[in-house]
Amino acid sequence: PLQGKTLDTEEEAIEQIAEWNEVKTFTPVIEENALCIYKDRQRPVLVKGVPDNYTELSHIQDIVTSGTFQLNDGRIDYVSLGIGVAGQLGVVANSPYPVELYAPNRLGKVNLANPSQSFNGRRIFVSSTFCANQAIYDDQLAIIPLSTAREMFSYTTEATAIELRLTPTTNENEFAKKLREHLGDAYRVATHMQQNDWYKWVQIEKWITFLILSFILMIATFNVIGALSMLIVDKKRDIDTLQNLGA
């Protein structure tokens, strides 16, 4: 959408697109920035929540470098990381240790007294890594199930974008024109090439989010240190009192 970050996937004009003959795959996605932590390393990532039919849209399984691309095995959710993200975190596919994803609480305010309540977190295991040979994907993307992304970012039926795979005989530019006429001025329609330019702006937003999250985590650390310091002082007073009493 041109205004705001999300669209409602249950809106009639959106649902109609899935029925068009030119559309082979209709895929709602959520893209939001988050902080990814693995052991003592951390970096900002672009979390992309996708539905089960994502492999029909992207054929991402063809660019997997390690592990097997899967986002859910019926019991556990998984994440697939760009090879650059995985390398900087030092994590490999099928690691017994999960990565942690943290994002600001979209519906709440920053709570400086208890910063942990200011963001949502998820622990999730890495099923695979992929290499698209494009830095905008390899160095920032973390793909998770759409349902998990909606929980993490407090969405229900919303999506930040709808990605489409067209039939082989469909002209991309002509279809984009038809789509703009159908949706009107309320939505942004972009071809694959135009989408790459948009990702450059996402990179800037990603680092801003990283700085904000780092600041919140730093405050949380200082709060813990302060609380421990006060506890030590109180305990020392108790020890001194007991010693004075001859204990």
Residue ranges and their predicted role:
Residues D77-Y78, L141:
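A residue-level structural signature of the nucleotidyltransferase/glycosyltransferase Rossmann-like core
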Residues N94-A186:
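Basic-flanked hydrophobic alpha-helices used for secretion and membrane insertion
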Residues P1-L46, D52, E56, D62-R75:
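Hydrophobic, regular-secondary-structure patches
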Residues Q134, P168-I225, L231-D234:
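Peri-transmembrane interface segments
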Residues A18-K24, L89, Y187, K206:
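Structural motif
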